């Protein structure tokens, strides 16, 4: 272990907001969870009813004939024969009035909303989404975060990897994938920080659960919110510390801490009932700690993995993570603050709104603002819990793990060039070619992959592969990173010792000491987890899904700066699994993109996974 003098202030840029709880302006404005959900549903078809089921409030473990909470969903999926169809129309709006009363110069919306439709399906359904890109100059692609895309790699939505961007001014394509998993997730543009401008939405796949509940409240997304355009922010963060978010939207709404304009998200609880709430962090940079005053939450799913029930007082959500929780409305009928706080001394983000909050209202109680502000939750130090245990177990041996160059992915920050902040993994920063994605190489049999695509080829078939990710022990400073894998869930086998995120202590994996820290006996399994600041993380995934799968930091500015690799899993098998229909559609979109790109007025100036327009440095004032 090494301890470095902290240079973290260069990145944080300001004092961290304390782990404070709600002390909001006195306004009673509220917006109900159901109202917000119904507003976002416009543009999608209603969920088709399914056959009568054994899934009832007293027995959520059962689902349908032959399928329940113990079914291995990676092996068996209900055959519903149902397709849930949606149409997404992407548009740009200038001088848009935001939910907290501040006009934004430009936003990019799906079907006219700051969040797109909530995609709802049942376990086993097929989801079909036609995306029409009516943006002015930006291409787009839609990634279905956490969806494994078994045998549908070309529908993963990672431009420059699995497809060319959908060109603007009317370009379109249709994504199709099977809901082989169930739980809560989200979708977003992978053409950028573009999702920070509004090209984002939620996914709810109904299925069994590990704990009974009476009422499903649906999705509850939380996101950082900036008054400046996200693409401009990415340009700014190439050479400057990222600014704190201007506000935090909870289920699409917020109160402005300076003016009192806007509304609190309101969730109505039925006294005596158990409520399922699907909490998501759909941010570009902010990580959150959440808690409900005078209530506990019982976790039943982490990302899209059902877990054995685990009761907590608070939760940490990294960017991209989701938790399904059950809340028992057994307290005195009243109004309670749902608090969003920040930890780690701003090492994983902060907001200029010091008290983001929502209101949980017991039906029948008087209206108004809660009076009990609660107490600060424990500081999670920018680390997600390792205590969750999946219902469907996976176990692997760990005592024989050997660190080698071919299974180690070092993460380093390069401050030697222009732009100032360049993030490298395995010695290289990713920089994809929108007009020649990796799939193009697969289809043509060309194995001369560019170094800039940062490919890690994995040829093993149906084997557990182990990956050690290490933050640079010699770098000027070290930050935590929310690492997300496409195409798989991974096992979280272990990480370096839990220390304060801002301490700048450094740890390198030492088998003599750290093998004892590993857990291969049904460890946490998910698609996003935290690489500790100054530390290491050991993951494993099984090579059972041929494809080109990104593995990247989900902080928009970091992946824009190169922090990603592309696992090319079993390329020969991948070629055989690409249908003629998918190949034809891939070529059509690429032909349209290649015809458009020479006319685009803005140059490509980043990794390609986070696209933004060029702005002059003089447009920016550092806070």
Curated annotation (Swiss-Prot):
Give the cofactor binding note.
Binds 4 Cu cations per monomer.
**Thermal behavior of activity:** Optimum temperature is 60-70 degrees Celsius.
Q: Which GO terms describe its cellular component?
A: extraorganismal space
User: Could you confirm whether the keyword Signal appears in this record?
Assistant: yes
Q: Where is the signal peptide?
A: 1-22
Biological process according to GO:
cellulose catabolic process; lignin catabolic process
Q: How does activity depend on pH?
A: Optimum pH is 3.5 with 2,2'-azinobis-(3-ethylbenzthiazoline-6-sulphonate) as substrate, 5.0-7.5 with guiacol as substrate, and 6.0-7.0 with syringaldazine as substrate.
Which keywords label this protein? Copper, Disulfide bond, Glycoprotein, Lignin degradation, Metal-binding, Oxidoreductase, Signal
Instruction: Give the positions annotated as glycosylation sites.
Output: 89, 138, 251, 266, 294, 339, 426, 446
List of residues binding Cu cation 3? 190, 486, 552
Which terms does the record give in the GO molecular function aspect? Answer: copper ion binding; hydroquinone:oxygen oxidoreductase activity
Q: List cofactor names only.
A: Cu cation
Protein EC: 1.10.3.2
Annotated function: Lignin degradation and detoxification of lignin-derived products.
The annotated subunit structure for this chain is: Monomer.
What is the name of this protein? Laccase-1
Source organism of the structure: Melanocarpus albomyces
Ranked from the top, the taxonomy reads: Eukaryota, Fungi, Dikarya, Ascomycota, Pezizomycotina
